[in-house]
Amino acid sequence: RARGNRVVYMSGDAIIAAQGKETYSILLTDIPITRGGTISFQVENAMASIGAAWALNLSWDVIRTGLRSFNNDPDSAPGRFNVFDYRGATLIADYGHNPDAIAALTKAVQAMPAKRRMVVISAAGDRRDEDIRQQTEILGTAFDDVLLYQDACQRGRADGEVLGLLRQGLVGATRTSHVEEIHGEFVAIDTALARLQAGDLCLILL
């Protein structure tokens, strides 16, 4: 900024875009995908979007309108942190299947209120063993219940191999107290929904 370059950064409860003495401010409460700034990776996405739109010389009215009107619902962004209410519980659907994504999702979930946290997860068989294990290593620090399911397509893995790796990642888990293996994605989701109570949170990894 001191050199007169454009910068985008977060300050307090707003995202700031500045160049020299020219400054624009957008409150996080005006950017729905950030859920008031509690979802850090969505704050980063919003900052990147602001920077890209500014570089294209879009007007700030257009940028603000775009940020205010974009929601990460199933119609706008399917499988990207879609949040639903279900009988007083919170459901989140996301297509995160690598350790970095799982870490970001876990951090986001920890910022949301919940009496009990549950996650439904499988893993792609064409990932490295350590990447599959690491996903549940991360989840085991933040979720009370972990429901493991075997996907219909194992991508070259033997029957039960992916489930075994996911279970290995939960050895020594600091928070998880309930682990269940289920065959079939939809059966696993139905099982999770049946266990949910008002005030719970369930992350479903599609």
Region spans (language model):
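Acidic-glycine-rich active-site phosphate/pyrophosphate-binding loop
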Residues: 5-31
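Phosphate/Mg2+-binding loops and adjacent switch elements
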Residues: 1-2
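Conserved phosphate/anionic-ligand binding catalytic regions in large, soluble enzymes, centered on
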Residues: 41-45
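ATP-dependent carboxylate-amine ligase
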Residues: 23-39, 51-206
